[in-house]
Amino acid sequence: YSITLSRSPIRNACKVLFFACLVSVGTLIFFPDDFVRFGILHLLGFGMLVSPFFKSPRVNLLIGVALFFLSYLPLNYPAWALPISGGEQYFSMMDYYPLIPWLSYFFLGLASGQRKYFAAYDQPVTNSMLKLLLLPGRYSLIVYLVHQLVILAILILILGSPR
């Protein structure tokens, strides 16, 4: 929903995709057998990148529903189509969110944000306690990256070196 409020969605998408690439390179170095090839940041970055070109809530709703139902078709994707779907049959990965079906949820959220279903939440927050609760959302990319590093560090301490 917040992508509909952004003043610079392409810049934000590029930032997310940059960190997605860093995650891929980092996991390739430390976990070469299970590295992230197309994870949640790749998915969100791609969705953010294409979202400015889809302005109609109705079209976005149709795309979201179509992508969702497309995921139920028994299609065999080749290994090179990993970002689209079916990569789990070829590779072991720590994090995998293919475009089908996960992009459907992005488009459904985009459609609802464009329809202003959440218009009540567009009001400025004046309560200091609420502002504090909204703070993690403002820095969600940093929160996501840091929590991943903390979890991996704890797992390495408990289970030992990944190699």
Regions found by a protein language model. Give the residues of each.
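Alpha-helical transmembrane segments and their immediate juxtamembrane cytosolic regions
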Residues: Y1-R163
